[in-house]
């Protein structure tokens, strides 16, 4: 639909939902319109359940105080699990990267989620992500190895370089995922087999 003309004939609540959905990543005006009209036709319980789920998401989910993954309590399920290997920390950019690595079934250590990457052109620097918090953990916890699993793109490699340089004086083994992941891609889209092989074949930095 033509946003400048056709949308003006719609009721205000419909326009508002289209505009809000259009703010989501990967959702353009046409998809936002289709979703809005689908919800308009749907039984009342579906939009209401969706609204409740969105409210619960923002009110009940927070960041783990240790690794910055997502949780409903103070510690996430991974940090709270005594069976996880406390000696190894895998550093990732985003929470979805944790989900991708867990899907491989080959990793049993802990995580540290940066919530971003070092990208000066985007205004993202070391102090804008959970970079120094990782260094504090390595100093305070019985960590022997840090696996750097940032994305295989320019920003991810730059972040890995800065991490390696900061970790070097702390006396821990620093490794990087093996080559084989699609260059320029995101970890979350890697298939479990390829990602698992990259973990098992990780190399010293």
Swiss-Prot record:
Q: Which InterPro entries is this protein grouped with?
A: DNA_Rcmb_RecR (IPR000093), Rcmb_RecR (IPR023627), Rcmb_RecR_Znf (IPR015967), TOPRIM_dom (IPR006171), TOPRIM_RecR (IPR034137)
A Pfam family for this UniProt protein? RecR_ZnF
Per UniProt, the C4-type Zn-finger stretches lie at 64-79
Tell me the disulfide pairings in this chain.
none
Q: Name one GO molecular function term.
A: DNA binding
Q: What does this protein do?
A: May play a role in DNA repair. It seems to be involved in an RecBC-independent recombinational process of DNA repair. It may act with RecF and RecO.
Q: Which HAMAP family match?
A: RecR
Protein name according to UniProt: Recombination protein RecR
- This protein's species is Roseiflexus sp. (strain RS-1)
Q: Which gene encodes it?
A: recR
């Amino acid at each position: 639909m033509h946003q400048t003309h056709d949308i003006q004939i719609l009721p205000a609540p419909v326009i508002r939902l289209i505009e809000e959905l259009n703010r989501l990543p990967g959702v353009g005006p046409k998809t936002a319109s289709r979703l809005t009209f689908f919800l308009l036709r749907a039984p009342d319980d579906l939009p209401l359940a969706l609204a409740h789920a969105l409210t619960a998401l923002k009110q009940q989910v927070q960041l783990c105080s240790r690794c910055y993954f997502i949780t409903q309590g103070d510690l996430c399920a991974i940090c709270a699990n005594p069976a996880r290997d406390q000696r190894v920390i895998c550093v990732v950019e985003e929470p979805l990267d944790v989900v991708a690595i867990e899907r491989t079934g080959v990793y049993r250590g802990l995580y540290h989620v940066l919530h971003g990457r070092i990208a000066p052109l985007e205004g993202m620097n070391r102090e804008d992500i959970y970079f120094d918090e990782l260094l504090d953990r390595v100093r305070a916890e019985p960590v022997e190895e840090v696996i750097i699993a940032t994305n295989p793109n320019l920003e991810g490699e730059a972040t890995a370089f800065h991490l390696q340089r900061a970790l070097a004086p702390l006396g821990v083994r620093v490794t990087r995922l093996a080559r084989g992941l699609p260059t320029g891609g995101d970890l979350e889209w890697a298939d479990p087999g390829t990602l698992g092989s990259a973990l098992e074949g990780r190399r010293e930095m």
